[in-house]
C-alpha cells in the first residue's frame, strides 16, 4: 500500500533528524561551557565545572534521547516494511530501549507506551510478518503512539529548544558583554580624543567586530532552535497522521472493541484488559483487508502528511 510505504520511506529523514537533534543536546551544553568568559581564574573553574556537568548529565541524556527517538523511527520504518512486505530483519533492543527511557525525565506512562510500541511491532514482525497486518499495526498501536509522541516532543521542546539553546544564547551575551565592556573601559580612559585618535579608532573597530561576532553566533543558535522546533513539529505531525490512518482503518471510531483488543493482544507480551469495551456485534467483526474506500482516504492524508513534514526535514538537514 503506497500510503504506508510513503510513511515508511520518511523513516530515514526522521532518523537523521533524531540523530542531529539528540547529538546537539550534548553539543549545546558543551558550547555554553566554552562561552564562559575566561578573564579570571574563577571563570576558568566555572567553565571546567560546566564541561564536567555536560559529560555527567547531558552526554547520557543525549544518547538516551536518541534511543527514545529511535522507537518512532523504527516503528515508522516497520510500517513501511509491512506495506511492501519487505522484511529487513527489524530487531529493536527492548532492554536498551527500556533502560534508555528510564533515564529520561518523561512521564512514566509515556515510558511504558514507548516500550509497548517496540514490543508490539517486534512481536508482529517476528511472529506474523504479513501485509494483512498493516491495519492491525496502525489500529493497535495508535493510543501508545499518541501518548509517546506527545511526551517525547514536549520533552525535546522544553529541555532542548527552550532551555539548553536559550542558555547558550545567554552565555554568548555574557561572553561578548565581558569583552565589549573591557573595550568600553579603555575607551573611557582616553582623556584627550585628539591626541588618541588612532587608539580610539582601533578600539571602536574592536567593539564593532565583537558586536558583529556576537550577532553571528546568536544567529547560529537561532537556526538550531528552528531545527529543534522543526523536529518537534515533525514528531507531532507524524502522530497526527497516524491517528488519521487509525480512524480510517477503524470506521472513524476512536475506541477498540473487545474483538480488536484480543487480536492486538496476540502481539503484546503483556495482554490488555477487555473490560468496559464496545462489544456490538457489527463493531466486533474486524475486517483486516484494506478496502478501496480506505485506500483512497489513506492516500489523501498521506499526501497531506508528506507535504507538511518534507519542509520540516529539509530545515533540519540544511
Residue ranges and their predicted role:
Residues 1-2, 316-318:
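Short, solvent-exposed mixed-charge patches
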Residues 2-116, 256-257, 261-277, 281-298:
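N-terminal Sec/ER secretory leader and immediately downstream segment
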Residues 73-76, 80, 98, 102, ...:
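Alpha-helical repeat scaffolds in large eukaryotic proteins
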Residues 79, 180-183, 235, 287, ...:
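Generic alpha-helical secondary structure signal
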Residues 20, 34, 40, 65, ...:
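Residue-identity detector for threonine
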Residues 106-269, 273:
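Extended amphipathic alpha-helical interaction segments
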Residues 6-9, 13-16, 20, 67-74, ...:
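Charged, amphipathic alpha-helical oligomerization/scaffolding segments
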Amino acid at each position: 500500500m503506497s500510503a504506508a510505504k510513503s510513511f515508511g520511506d520518511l523513516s530515514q529523514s526522521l532518523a537523521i533528524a533524531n540523530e542531529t537533534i539528540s547529538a546537539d543536546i550534548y553539543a549545546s551544553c558543551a558550547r555554553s561551557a566554552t562561552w564562559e568568559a575566561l578573564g579570571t581564574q574563577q571563570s576558568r573553574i566555572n567553565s571546567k565545572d560546566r564541561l564536567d556537568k555536560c559529560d555527567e548529565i547531558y552526554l547520557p541524556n543525549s544518547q538516551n534521547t536518541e534511543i527514545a527517538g529511535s522507537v518512532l523511527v523504527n516503528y515508522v520504518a516497520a510500517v513501511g516494511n509491512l506495506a511492501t512486505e519487505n522484511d529487513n530483519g527489524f530487531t529493536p533492543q527492548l532492554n536498551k530501549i527500556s533502560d534508555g527511557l528510564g533515564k529520561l525525565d518523561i512521564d512514566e506512562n509515556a515510558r511504558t507506551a514507548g516500550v509497548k510500541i517496540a514490543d508490539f511491532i517486534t512481536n508482529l514482525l517476528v511472529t506474523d510478518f504479513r501485509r494483512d497486518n498493516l491495519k492491525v499495526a496502525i489500529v493497535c498501536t495508535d493510543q501508545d503512539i499518541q501518548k509517546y509522541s506527545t511526551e517525547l516532543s514536549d520533552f525535546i521542546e522544553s529541555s532542548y529548544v527552550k532551555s539548553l539553546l536559550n542558555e547558550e544564547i545567554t552565555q554568548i551575551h555574557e561572553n561578548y558583554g565581558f569583552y565589549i565592556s573591557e573595550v568600553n573601559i579603555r575607551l573611557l580612559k582616553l582623556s584627550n580624543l585628539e591626541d588618541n585618535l588612532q587608539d580610539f579608532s582601533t578600539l571602536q573597530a574592536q567593539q564593532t567586530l565583537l558586536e558583529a561576532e556576537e550577532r553571528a553566533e546568536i544567529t547560529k543558535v537561532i537556526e538550531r532552535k528552528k531545527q529543534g522546533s522543526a523536529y518537534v513539529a515533525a514528531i507531532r505531525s507524524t502522530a497526527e497522521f497516524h491517528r488519521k490512518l487509525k480512524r480510517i482503518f477503524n470506521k472513524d471510531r476512536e475506541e477498540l472493541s473487545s474483538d480488536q483488543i484480543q487480536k492486538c493482544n496476540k502481539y503484546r507480551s503483556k495482554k490488555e484488559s477487555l473490560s468496559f469495551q464496545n462489544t456490538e456485534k457489527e463493531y466486533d467483526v474486524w475486517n483486516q483487508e484494506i478496502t478501496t474506500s480506505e485506500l483512497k482516504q489513506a492516500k489523501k492524508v498521506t499526501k497531506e502528511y508528506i507535504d507538511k513534514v518534507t519542509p520540516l526535514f529539509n530545515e533540519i538537514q540544511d
